From Swiss-Prot:
PANTHER family: TRNA-SPLICING ENDONUCLEASE SUBUNIT SEN34, TRNA-SPLICING ENDONUCLEASE SUBUNIT SEN34-RELATED. SUPFAM superfamilies: tRNA-intron endonuclease catalytic domain-like. NCBIfam families: endA. It comes from Schizosaccharomyces pombe (strain 972 / ATCC 24843). It catalyses: pretRNA = a 3'-half-tRNA molecule with a 5'-OH end + a 5'-half-tRNA molecule with a 2',3'-cyclic phosphate end + an intron with a 2',3'-cyclic phosphate and a 5'-hydroxyl terminus. Keywords: Lyase, tRNA processing. This is Probable tRNA-splicing endonuclease subunit sen34. Belongs to the tRNA-intron endonuclease family. The gene is sen34. One of its GO terms (molecular function) is lyase activity. Its EC number is 4.6.1.16. Heterotetramer composed of sen2, sen15, sen34 and sen54. Interacts directly with sen15. GO terms for biological process: tRNA-type intron splice site recognition and cleavage. GO terms for cellular component: tRNA-intron endonuclease complex. The active site is at Y206, H214, K245.
């Protein structure tokens, strides 16, 4: 289990996780929260309790791959491969499995209903004919509501070295190194990070699981030699203090690495990050 890798589906530029076990492992062991974006067709306007899939930011996805716990799956190509390799016998077998599952669920429901009837009749001292616990296998059922296992994960596990899977270099070609290093440095020290758009920053940092704690920091990353306007320093400090948080900025010093040529991505990813916190004294 410890060596198991979980697939991250790459769908139209988004990183999605469809496995509940993966969501649990990412959150518990790697402090990766993600954002649940799944909604029920019957309740398209719901915005409180969303479900799978879970969408990952580019930083979260790259962090999990760098830790060796995940790999990228090109979802479009995998589904095309599945359709091309699916035979009529596979379709028949799938329908047969769903119909068998429908029988089992219906019998279980009838059994539970009969048990309730027996309990009620015992209290009344009467007997009542019960519904038979069987169905004609030739009866037709609406199978659209019967759940089926997705095969995307199994295909991904079997074909992890296949050409149908995206190269990480292509997927993360435009990764912002400074932003990622800031993200990584905080997660590695035990923080949980969420998107910080609502507070006008890159990330919001929590000292523990976001379901149990309030966020402590508004996080922004900068290049080492990047000039930060004084107005930004004042605005960031005032905003952080106003919402009872601290504005945290930071960056990595890459001036002394590979001065004679272009810096490699591998060299940049090893750089340490320095952090600076800013508060607005006597305000808020």
């Amino acid at each position: 289990m410890e060596d198991e890798k979980f697939p991250i589906s790459y769908v139209h530029g988004k990183f999605l996780v469809f496995d509940v076990q993966a969501v649990e492992v990412f959150r518990k062991n790697y402090h990766i929260l993600g954002t649940l974006v799944g909604t029920l067709p019957q309740l398209p306007q719901q915005n409180v309790f969303l479900g799978l899939p879970m969408e990952l930011s580019k930083e979260e996805a790259f962090y999990l791959i760098e830790k060796g716990i995940s790999y990228i799956v090109d979802d479009t190509k995998v589904h095309k491969q599945l359709l091309e390799n699916t035979t009529k016998d596979d379709v028949k077998q799938c329908l047969k499995k769903r119909q068998s599952l429908a029988y089992d669920q219906m019998i279980a429901a009838k059994k539970k209903e009969n048990e309730k009837k027996i309990e009620i009749m015992k209290k009344l001292g009467r007997t009542l004919p019960l519904d038979p616990l069987n169905y004609d296998e030739h009866d037709s059922f609406d199978l659209s509501w019967i759940p089926v296992d997705t095969v995307t994960t199994r295909i991904a596990e079997k074909s992890s070295m296949n050409d149908d899977f995206h190269k990480e270099e292509d997927v993360f070609e435009n990764l912002d190194i400074n932003r990622y290093l800031m993200f990584k440095s905080l997660v590695d020290t035990g923080f949980y990070l969420n998107p910080g758009l609502r507070f006008g920053c890159q990330f919001v940092a929590y000292p523990g699981d976001a379901l149990r704690y309030h966020s402590h920091y508004l996080v922004n990353s900068y290049k080492w030699d990047q000039e930060i306007p004084v107005l930004f320093l004042i605005g960031g400090g005032r905003l952080g203090t106003a919402v009872k948080k601290t504005w945290l900025i930071g960056g990595s010093n890459d001036r002394n690495i590979n001065m004679n040529g272009e810096k490699s991505k591998e060299e940049l990813l090893l750089l340490p990050v320095r952090h600076f916190s800013i508060e607005w004294a006597g305000f808020g």
